[in-house]
Swiss-Prot record:
Keywords: Chaperone, Endoplasmic reticulum, Membrane, Transmembrane, Transmembrane helix. This is DnaJ homolog subfamily C member 18. One of its GO terms (biological process) is chaperone cofactor-dependent protein refolding. Pfam families: DnaJ, DUF1977. GO terms for molecular function: Hsp70 protein binding. Residues 82-146 form the J domain. The gene is DNAJC18. GO terms for cellular component: endoplasmic reticulum membrane. The chain crosses the membrane at residues 228-248. It is found in: Endoplasmic reticulum membrane. It comes from the Eukaryota. It is a single-pass membrane protein.
Length: 358
């Protein structure tokens, strides 16, 4: 009996020693162990672990992180009511001030550097605003019509609603290439390829609304053939009247250009200004003497109007090239503008001189 009790005591002492070496019971997990005897340590350990897991998750999502300043900047662009507010310049800002403001905003809102929701749309708005305000003609028309026609709204409401006359002739991507030497300083460019969740949401909602509208319109359409015919009857009447009018209308006796389909294949010149024109084979029978003289005056007037219009187009083209060369400081555009000949303007000057001399 004494030997048995001695063995039990030795077993108890061995168990106590094992517990002391492990510092906690075997069935208690290490993370829930409280070394100081209070439950606050366990709670603090759990909170620290959760914080570390959240930090690791945010670091894994670094490509889509954005700062509060970037988000506020996008929201400011969305609230702008005109192009001057978008660029943050006054209405009498010079070209240099516009370029400086654009460079600053383009670097700040480029999709490669700003991942805030709506940053891509804000970047487009900045590029469009600069492209319009940097063009003297478009800026003059924009200032004349006012800024109530130009609005920038959130992506979930509606995309851009810019006044069509003030749409830019150059895209934000082309502007960025011009200012930053064909590539953006941050490296690889995927301009406008970042589609935000808001944009996906808008397209899904817009598609759903459009489908719903189409269904409603189909339900409202008349289902009978007679009703459809009654609706198309006014259109058919207009088409028939137009065809009859064209059949009854007589072709003019001349053309300033060669038109074999209408029979204008015989070349002639006016006696006064030597203006070339074309007639059909029956022209000599219908026009002689005074009637021919009056007709040639009409031909010369039409020809001068045509040359005047062509001269205006040539001047407009040369002016646009000159403006672009000055805006982008491109020597090739400048040389092209200087070498562009105004042939129709030279013809117009000669014709006016002959007309005054005659």
């Amino acid at each position: 009996m004494a030997a048995t009790l001695g063995s039990g005591e030795r077993w108890t002492e061995a168990y106590i020693d094992a517990v002391r070496r492990n510092k906690y019971p075997e069935d208690t997990p290490p993370e829930s162990h409280d070394p100081c005897g209070c439950c606050n340590c366990v709670k603090a350990q759990k909170e620290k672990k959760s914080e570390n897991e959240w930090t690791q998750t945010r670091q894994g999502e670094g490509s889509s992180m954005y700062s509060e300043e970037q988000l506020l900047g996008v929201q400011r662009i969305k609230k702008c009511r005109n192009y001057y507010e978008i660029l943050g310049v006054s209405r009498d800002a010079s070209d240099e001030e516009l370029k400086k403001a654009y460079r600053k905003l383009a670097l700040k809102f480029h999709p490669d550097k700003n991942c805030a929701p709506g940053a891509t749309d804000a970047f487009k708005a900045i590029g469009n605003a600069f492209a319009v305000l940097s063009n003297p003609d478009k800026r003059l028309r924009y200032d004349e019509y006012g800024d109530e026609q130009v609005t920038f709204t959130a992506p979930r409401a509606r995309p851009y609603n810019y006044y069509r006359d003030f749409e830019a002739d150059i895209t934000p991507e082309e502007l960025s290439n011009v200012f930053f030497g064909g590539h953006f300083p941050t490296g690889n460019i995927h301009m406008f390829s970042n589609v935000t969740d808001d944009a996906h949401y808008y397209r899904r909602r817009h598609r759903h609304e459009r489908t719903q509208t189409q269904k409603e319109e189909e339900e409202e359409k008349p289902q009978t053939t007679y009703s459809a015919f009654i609706q198309l009857l006014p259109v058919l009447v207009i088409v028939i009247i137009s065809v009859i009018t064209q059949l009854l209308a007589t072709n003019p006796p001349y053309s300033l250009f060669y038109k074999s389909t209408l029979g204008y294949t015989i070349s002639r010149e006016t006696q006064n200004l030597q203006v070339p024109y074309f007639v059909d084979k029956n022209f000599d029978k219908a026009y002689r003497g005074a009637s021919l003289h009056d007709l040639e005056k009409t031909i010369e007037k039409d020809y001068i109007d045509y040359i005047r219009t062509s001269c205006w187009k040539e001047k407009q083209q040369k002016s646009e090239l000159t403006n672009l060369a000055g805006l982008y400081r491109d020597e090739r555009l400048k040389q092209k503008a200087e070498s562009l000949k105004l042939e129709n303007c030279e013809k117009l000057s000669k014709l006016i001189g002959l007309r005054r001399g005659g």
